[in-house]
Design a protein with these regions (language model features):
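N-terminal polybasic/positive-inside topogenic patches
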Residues: 24-25, 35-37, 50, 55, ...
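Short, positively charged and aromatic/hydrophobic N-terminal segments
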Residues: 34, 43, 66-73, 81
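N-terminal helix-forming leader/targeting segments
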Residues: 1-4, 29-35
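Non-heme Fe(II) oxygenase catalytic core, chiefly the N-lobe of the double-stranded beta-helix
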Residues: 80-357, 362-387
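Hydrophobic alpha-helical membrane-insertion segments
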Residues: 20, 29, 42-45
Length: 387
């Protein structure tokens, strides 16, 4: 039976009353469900292991029952027992699509992501582009299916968002220096693949990319997904006290860990990390890589230049410390923040297919690729836009 389980919101759509505060406890024996709520209309029913709210404004919120929740917990006394209660700030889980005139946006998860339909990337109109850009800022990551585009098409579409960013790792394809191949061959059993580990793209640059784009050409039949986590939602759900602590901090971003790992486990022929792996002594790295290993500082909390939305800027791969703190002081803070950002409630996951084009706001989310497709070829092409 169920001993003492807690219910946590995995998705709350637009339109749920901003005054909602709740906790849910299930107990065995009488199988009682106790609810404390305010401004929550309609009945709540138990369906399998989930509690379901009636639809409001075309949306439906679902509460998943879980044994543990790693963040956002506080303790309350209830009948002489200590009960963990999850309280999500109201209105933060709002990934509902806006009304568009020339495109259709279909949300991918409660936290972020949307599929954009009704668009041919090779012939995007000005009206469509404005709505695509708006959808990107709202959903943090958007993607298009069944696109048949050339390198010229991808470069041209990317350039509409701004100037190309400096590429940290790879050389571009012939004739298109800003379109970088991201390829893993079927016969390469890599211990480390490009993009594995939670990360922002190139945060060690003085101007990290604002937007990143990937186009899938050859996709394995199994594995090879990409997952994103919403750093803005993660920041919004922290306490005001934590906000005050984090706001003045500067984080150090460096390629140091990637270089060390690549030199240890990646073969010189493995693209695009082979350029690093080919040089086994960090002192012999090319000058441009030396600069990226040295890294730079960025604010831990950054405001989006277009929307003003505040987001955490740290990751598992490139963040090496906090300015003015010892490693012993900084590491627990950074570990907590990355764990908080990457909890499943804040993520969306994309299953690639040939012809899928995905783009994301590198300032508002982090992502990682999965190394789970050995024996199959994976070919994508990346462009990045300067921040």
């Amino acid at each position: 039976g169920i001993s003492m389980w807690m219910a946590s919101i995995w998705g709350v759509c637009a339109g749920v009353d901003s005054a909602i505060k709740h906790s849910i406890r299930l107990t065995s024996g009488a199988a009682a469900t106790r609810l404390r709520k305010r401004s929550l209309a309609g009945k709540i029913t138990l369906v399998g292991s989930a509690l379901r709210l009636p639809a409001r404004r075309g949306c439906e919120a679902e509460f998943s029952v879980n044994r543990r929740y790693n963040s956002g917990q506080m303790q309350t006394a209830d009948d002489d027992r200590r009960v963990a209660m999850i309280v999500h700030p109201a209105g933060k889980f709002d990934n509902a699509a806006c009304a568009h005139q020339s495109i259709e946006a279909v949300p991918l998860s409660a936290a972020m992501g949307a599929e954009i339909r009704g668009v041919d990337i090779s012939t995007v109109t000005d009206d469509q582009f404005q709505e695509i850009e708006s959808a990107l800022f709202r959903h943090k990551m958007i993607f298009f299916r069944d696109q048949e585009i050339s390198h010229a098409d991808q470069a041209g579409f990317s350039r509409r968002f701004g100037e190309f960013a400096e590429d940290a790792y790879t050389q571009g394809v012939a004739g298109y220096s800003d379109v970088q191949p991201v390829i893993k061959e079927a016969d390469v059993a890599a211990k480390m693949i490009f993009g594995s580990g939670w990360h922002h793209d190139a945060p060690f640059l003085e101007r990290p990319p604002a937007i990143s784009m990937l186009y899938g050409v050859d996709i394995p039949p199994i594995g090879g997904d990409t997952i994103w986590a919403n750093s803005a939602l993660a920041y919004a759900t922290l306490s005001p006290t934590m906000h005050q602590l984090l706001e003045p901090l500067m984080v150090h971003m460096s390629m140091r860990r990637v270089v060390a790992t690549a030199q240890a486990v990646v073969g010189p022929g493995d693209s695009p990390l082979g350029r690093i792996a080919a040089t086994r002594d960090v002192q012999q790295l090319p000058a441009d890589l030396e600069r990226k290993v040295a890294g730079t500082y960025h604010p831990l909390v950054r405001a989006h230049p277009r929307t003003g939305e505040r987001a955490l800027f740290c990751d598992r791969t490139y963040t090496t410390g906090i300015k003015g703190m010892t490693p012993e002081e900084a590491t627990p803070i950074l570990d907590f923040l990355v764990t908080h950002i990457t909890q499943p409630a804040f993520t969306c996951r994309l299953r690639w297919a040939p012809g899928t084009l995905a783009l994301w706001d590198n300032r508002l989310c982090i992502h990682q690729a999965f190394n789970d497709h050995d024996g199959y070829r994976r070919e994508l092409y990346r462009t990045t836009i300067a921040g």
